[in-house]
Amino acid sequence: MKEKLWLLFLIAFSFNAYAQDVPPPNSLYVATQCFVNDGATFAEVVEEARSADISGPNSVFFRQPVAGNGAAPNQFTRVVVWDNMEHWATNVLIVPTESYTCDNANRSFWANRVLGTNRNAYDGTDVSLVTTRLCFIERGHTIADVYKSLNDGALAREAMGDTTMSMVSHLFLGPSTGTDMRTRIIIRRIGDSEAGLARSLDMLNEGDVGIGTPVNVPAEHCQDAALTRSYIIRRNN
């Protein structure tokens, strides 16, 4: 009996320790691949989406590839930001569209955590640049380990004058063919403006950039970052 109680104590302690190591997600990101319909332009897509009556989510962004990873010429990503799964489940609405089509059957759901202290993405603008890098958590490590190392890196960059907002997103629902569950992450950086992110990239390229996984991050198989131009479609808070 004492052994069972001791085991339960250890399990409870380990869960509490994990909870203290990593903050809860700041938001839920639901990402969907979308395509501009024949005869339409991306500008028309943005105009149509901005005129739609969408009151449920916190924010909606359309991200158009600039330096993508094999994206089709008419492809873009719709990112819808919610508080959590309950917020999504009680407010989600698929609005009919004319100028674009989205693959709503293959949405991906990401627990999103903000890194560092910068919170000034899209500062005075509704368009900015975003980089995203896909990585996989190393076996034997957790999102808490990844968060801590990435957060330390973000704080160090901010101390050097970096104005970008950094995030790490952790996939928990959606397509992830050929990988272990809950290992896929995206490291995201959003500029306070297009020029702001460009300056940040210039600063990173001034020194010894290195190769492979970001230094001290317990992740593997990191891809080169993709660059998108991100348009605010709606912000409800």
Please give the residue ranges for each predicted region.
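Sec-dependent N-terminal signal peptides
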Residues: 4-13
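C-terminal segment of classical bacterial N-terminal signal peptides
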Residues: 13-19
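Short S/T/G/P-rich N-terminal loop/turn motif that feeds into the first structured element of a domain
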Residues: 19-237
